[in-house]
C-alpha cells in the first residue's frame, strides 16, 4: 500500500517529513515529492502550494508519477462549527467547491460542470480516521462538509453568504475539492483532514498566523494515527 499525502504549506507537512524514514526526494515542475516510510506505510509527501490550481497540479503529478493507492489531504482550515475550537479537526464527509456557480445550466451551486456536486471520501479512509480519533487526547474531531475556494475567508458577510449556500459546512479551505476532483478523475480514493487555524471571521488573519503551526501539527498527528489504522488490503 502506498499513500500520497498533500499539504499546501510547509507547516502542514513539516512534521510528517520529519517523522519519515528512508526518505528520497524528487522535484517535478518545481514541486518536491518525498518518498519514504511513515507509520509503517509507504508514503509520498508533497507541499503543493496554495490554491486549487497548485493543488490540482501536485495531485496529478503525484498520481501519474507514484501511483498511490489513496491520497490524504492534510492541513489547516477555517472553522464554521461553534463546538469546535482552534486546533480541532474536521474529517471530510464530503467535499465541495464553494466558489463555483454554473447554476444557469442546471447544476447545483458549487457543482462544476460535468462533475459531481460533492466528492465523497473513501469509506475505508474515513473509518481509519474515526478509529484514530480516540488517540487524539484533548483534540476534538468530527466528520463534516469541507468546502474549497480560492479565497481566504475572513469577512463575516461572506461567511454568512457561504452558509446560506452550504448550511452544513464545517470548514473551508483552499485545496481540498481540487484534490478530490483530480482523485475522482483518476479513480483514486481520498480523504481530506483539516485542523482549524481560525474561525473564518475578522480575526482570521491574526489567528491563522498565530495557529498555523499548531493546526499543521494536529492535522499531521491525525494523518499518522490514520496510517497506523489502515488495513493494507483495504485499497480502491
From Swiss-Prot:
Residues reported in the UniProt entry to bind substrate: 78, 153, 174-175
GO CC annotations on file: cytosol
Keywords carried by this UniProt record: Amino-acid biosynthesis, Hydrolase, Methionine biosynthesis
Enzyme Commission designation: 3.2.2.9
Catalytic-site annotation from UniProt: 12, 198
Gene3D superfamilies, A to Z: Nucleoside phosphorylase domain (3.40.50.1580)
NCBIfam families (alphabetical): MTA_SAH-Nsdase, PRK05584.1
Name of the protein in its database record: 5'-methylthioadenosine/S-adenosylhomocysteine nucleosidase
Organism: Shewanella baltica (strain OS195)
Gene this chain is encoded by: mtnN
